[in-house]
Amino acid sequence: MDRLADRSLTAASFAPEASDDPPAQAEVVIVGGGIIGASIAYHLAREGVTDVVVCERDTLTSGTTWHAAGLVAGARGTHTLTELAAYGREFYATLGALSGVDVGFTAPGSLSLARRPERADELAYARDVADHCGIEAHMVDLAQIRRLWPLLDPAGIVAGLHFPGDGYVNPGYAALGLAKAAHALGVSVREHCAVTGIDIEEGRVVGVHTSRGSVAAPTVVLAGGLWTRDLAALVGVSVPLYAAEHVHVKSGPIGAEVGGLPVLRDVDNSYYIRPEGDALLLGAFEPRGIPRPVADIPVGGHATFTPDWPHIEDIRVAAERAVPALVTAGFDRFINAPESFTPDTTLIMGETAEVAGLFVAAGMNSQGIIYAPGVGRELARWIVSGSPCFDSSAVDVQRFSPHQANRRYLHERTRESLGRLYAMHWPGYQSETPRGVRRTPLYQRHVEAGAAMGELNGLERPLWFGPPALVDAYDFRRPGWHDVVGREHATVREGVGVIDLSGFAKFEVAGAGALETLQFAASADVDLPVDRAVYTLFLNDHGGIEADGTVTRVAADRFLVVTPSSSRHRMLWLLRRRSQGQAATVTDLTSGTAVLGVFGPRSRELMSRVSPDDWSAEAHPYFAGRRVEIADGFAYALRVSFTGELGFEVYCDADLSINVLDALSEAGADLGLRMVGYLALDSLRLEKGYRHLGHDIGPYDDPVSAGLSFAVAWNKEVPFAGQRALEQRAQGPSTRVIHVALEDPEVRLWGEETVSVDGEPVGHLTSGAFGYTVGSSIGLAVVGVDVDPHDTRLSVRVRGVDHAARGSRSPFYDSAGARVRG
């Protein structure tokens, strides 16, 4: 019997009560009975939470799990994703014995092919991450590829990457096994029990409505796959995912032994092949997918679309050319079924910003089987502990902008997202569709100035100004933007540059309770004189870093809070929750306020040319702000700088920003003024060791291990959020952050590279870039607390080679901070 794509699976096989009405209350309700929901249920039970009910609208696995190909991999492109995937690979090997269900786990390995040198570079980086995480992986040559895959025509192949421990599992039976194991531990499973609504009281979830009655619960998990977006939207929660057609086809009998063949990924031709009995399964990740709105998906379980051979014709031809046996065997089954994809092709999980107690685990981008055990384990721990127990920044549901859940936006992005799984994963890659949706007030000026525009969370921003075009600039070794970014970097270090920082998340906290709100929300002491600012962290209740930024007291009862662009959605809701019970209002100023960063040793001179105010150090000291006249209007100038140079952040009404920029441009012409993009800013901030939210710090990091203890005021009259959790930690930090610079200026760092001492891994980079003033690639690295950063045996691994590096506890550029203080 062909057990793949089995539509007969049901919880009734182990839970006779699966057809009963749900219980009136539970500790946790999980919406969705696919492999993600089943994994969360099982891992919650393992954590001791068994008062759980899984509500499935049809039967188990009938959403998208049933038609998955079941690929299992131990390594992904980052340490976080590898941690999730590696646990899954280990778990599937034990699931059959654990559950009593034959889940069909087979581990013949996997083989990824490179048909061009750039792809070989990408595979080499992936091998490095795998090595660091303890996943066996080997770059292989053509002779080794022939031995691993005798049916493969090696023409056009330049290299391969072999993971001996990878394989595949039967996805439907794996989900059934997880659900059965969860049920054995006390979890309830209900089929034909569609969740139709979510109850909210005072910003917190209190239960759900189903087609068979209501369930009261303080925690609800939305694990409904492609239907999750619409269900979340019922209560105003943004979950940006969208469906697309996803195809795999099964060949006829091959006529040769195929059972021991590794999973084959011919990523340059957008397909994978894995054995299935005496046949081969061919799956497609075509460059241009076919998005499908939920309304197009057939009602009921096990939905499919009409087979569409013409759409995958190029992929079929490429596969038959590479594996000629497919031509003789032909194909006898075509499955075209829905799968969901996200704007950045990374899964979504975590607690929502808008509703406390409402969690999401969805948008797996056709990798749900790979991630299900890891997602289940980590979300269960998150629910039990109240905060993530791993570096969740890249997968957190709160990382998106709300507009990215717009269906038109998602429809266009999903055309691209499906193919991105097998496309080149260039450093700094920018999505191509849809673009120009969310713009700063200066967007058109940037375009006219020849900016290469990128995006962050859907916000357009300049990466650099002038040639080359973005599409021609991608490279792992020396990107095309290297020289132009270097010139912009030098402009800030030696003269003066302007950076559009309008994307900063900006909030006003005002009212009689504003000070109390921020003293609780911020780690620093914000009881400041008027027009003074402080750098601070915003922690969760367990001491993890939700965001960092500045707080400026602009009046006795009014504060300006500025945090990174990516934190806007998270910070709005965090501040609102922290202000509950206080006489304070939180207002999002982001869209209505532009910010121009004027940075460099000649920034004071430039500002004095466009403003009659006194810009001396005495009149405008470091971390001070004030209202100023500038150009033909007024602005608020804050003397802070993320570049390590003297500088000012100029905050003005959005409709004045062009006037301010034009005045600066005219006045600074003879000073060599340049517009500066975000890639130069990244290089500048790394030379100073400034942390970047989402890469260097996040909810799993505490201030001490992140090297940011200076931003914590331990002796405030009222403890700040997370303070008690930090103080109760029995042990000091096990890791710390160091600065790393390569000796060889020709080798490029991007982040995720392994740091070693005498060849033994001791940590990895969280950020990397070229430091133009330092003269080589630099980065921030998390290493063991006992690692001596000045050890002369320090090295960083790049594409399998350990390159000599120097380390430091302090930044390589102006470690005393004299230049930024002016």
Named regions from a protein language model:
Residues 1-28, 46-50:
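Extreme N-terminal leader/targeting segments of oxidoreductases
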Residues 2-8, 91-94, 98, 106, ...:
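Flavin (FAD/FMN) cofactor-binding and adjacent substrate-gating region
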Residues 4, 9-10, 399-539, 544:
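Acidic, proline/glycine-enriched N-terminal capping motif
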Residues 43-46, 70-72, 94, 101-109, ...:
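Active-site substrate-recognition segment that forms the wall
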Residues 45-65:
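Glycine-rich FAD pyrophosphate-binding loop
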Residues 70-148, 268-273, 277, 299, ...:
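Dinucleotide-binding Rossmann-like beta1-alpha1 core, especially the glycine-rich loop
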Residues 171, 268, 306, 310-434:
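C-terminal catalytic lobe of FAD-dependent flavoproteins
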Residues 425-453, 461-463, 473, 480, ...:
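Conserved, structured C-terminal
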